[in-house]
C-alpha cells in the first residue's frame, strides 16, 4: 500500500517578537558608525562584525539573548548546550536598496532586528 506523506523534516521555523532598543541607539548614532559598501550596490555593512559586543549595544544583546533562549529552550526544547555569539553587524539600506536572497550557512540561529523600516516590510 502506498501512503504519501509530507513531512517538514528540514523546515525553517521562524520566531518573531519585539525587542526594546536603547534610545541612544538612534538614527544619528547608527549613521555615525563606519560602514563598507557591498560590491553589488545593494547596501552597506558595519565594519564592526561583532556589533553586539560593543558596550553601546549591551542592553540590546541581552534582549536578543533572552529571545534566543526562549526559542532554543522553550520552543525547540533543546536540552543541552549554550549558544555562542559568532557575528553581528548592521546592514544599512538606502532608498531603492534591498538585501538579495542569501543564506547564513554557518549559523544554527540567524536573526534580524529592524531599527527603522516602512510599515508592513521586513
Annotated model-derived regions:
Residues 87-122:
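Catalytic core of non-heme Fe(II) oxygenases with the double-stranded beta-helix
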Residues 84:
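Active-site cores enriched in adjacent His and Asp/Glu residues with nearby glycine-rich loops
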Residues 1-81, 98:
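Non-heme Fe(II)/2-oxoglutarate
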Amino acid at each position: 500500500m502506498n501512503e504519501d506523506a509530507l513531512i517538514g523534516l528540514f523546515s525553517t521555523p521562524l520566531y518573531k517578537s519585539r525587542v526594546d532598543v536603547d534610545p541612544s541607539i538612534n538614527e544619528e548614532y547608527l549613521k555615525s558608525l563606519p560602514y563598507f559598501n557591498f560590491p553589488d550596490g545593494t547596501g552597506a555593512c558595519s565594519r564592526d562584525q561583532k556589533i553586539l559586543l560593543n558596550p553601546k549595544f549591551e542592553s540590546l544583546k541581552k534582549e536578543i539573548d533572552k529571545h534566543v533562549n526562549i526559542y532554543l529552550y522553550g520552543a525547540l526544547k533543546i536540552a543541552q548546550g549554550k549558544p555562542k555569539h559568532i557575528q553581528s553587524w548592521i546592514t544599512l539600506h538606502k532608498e531603492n536598496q534591498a538585501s538579495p536572497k542569501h543564506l547564513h550557512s554557518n549559523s544554527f540561529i540567524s536573526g534580524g532586528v529592524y531599527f527603522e523600516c516602512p510599515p508592513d516590510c521586513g
